[in-house]
């Protein structure tokens, strides 16, 4: 991270410094909350987790090389510097906000109900053709992960592409206050997190909190094909730019041609030009992601050649529509997360396979009071597509199995309460050369299924 002294940190978070004068003016090398990732001269912030209290590890982190610790407790007779704060979690956010303000780079904030990560990856791939880009790693998109991502920004970075994930009102405002985006991208307004946000209108309200702390001279990029986002009016005097498959959008695509599991070809139209590109990851939703990347590239002064190269350089992440070919199976690893819209999109991809189509689906979380019906509808959708075999695992997924079984379809349906139950029957269900889609909410830990299938 860029230079920041303990004095600067104490002032930023309103903490009280305890320690020697010399250390007060020393710079920290990084900020960590995991005692296992301590490095020389880092700042360790003792976060209280649901299972572990970081305060337990403060002495060990100092022995391992940390310069200072942030603590909510007075440390009697401490032989090392520490900063006393009311809340370590709030201090983490305050320090990140201060650090972000000190940085001279462009920030792209990406949010939405579905496709945040794949859109973030596409935008980073496009912008990476011209700029030195830092992007959110893994699922570091919440009020803990975003600050840690901010601290990874170095002086050489020219653009940061940050994923912002929320599940309740007020969270986006707090994230935007830290990120201070120059460009805001919203992928869609779906039904994820209905448990807290109650309706799609509630989700729209929560997601558009991202505009509250954006650069007043920045850009807003929205999916114009989304019925909710298409109603968004200028925010803070900024006229939104819309992308989509409809030719009335500012950025649109047509002549979309599926290459099966090998990706998609499309022709892209900008306000000034037209060009074609190949996307290596399958699915129509990836065309929308590419359009978001094109709009972001235009906002940052890129030309068509650079943008096309960035689109075609994109590679999938593990657990995100990642195609894995083994001696016996073709696996579509999309197990990182799931909601009804993303699961249906993945089923559309599977339906393009020219071998026997098998999907292993699990529970989708945080869908609110209509969760059973939504699982039922996903099962019905799989059957209507004519997927050969549907395997449903988990308590909620029993409704998925019911939704498929009640259709007049060729789809064979198997239901298991647990992953272990499925593993016992997998050899009976799967055939050599099958194409297998694996998808569920992250809490279902379906990466275990992917790992087992890779070894068959």
Regions found by a protein language model. Give the residues of each.
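Acidic, Mg2+-coordinating active-site environments of NTP-dependent enzymes
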Residues: 12-13, 71, 75-78, 185-331, ...
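Phosphate-binding loop of NTP-binding sites
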Residues: 8-11, 91-224, 228-238, 428, ...
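N-terminal leader/targeting and accessory segments in enzymes
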Residues: 1-94, 252, 354-355, 381, ...
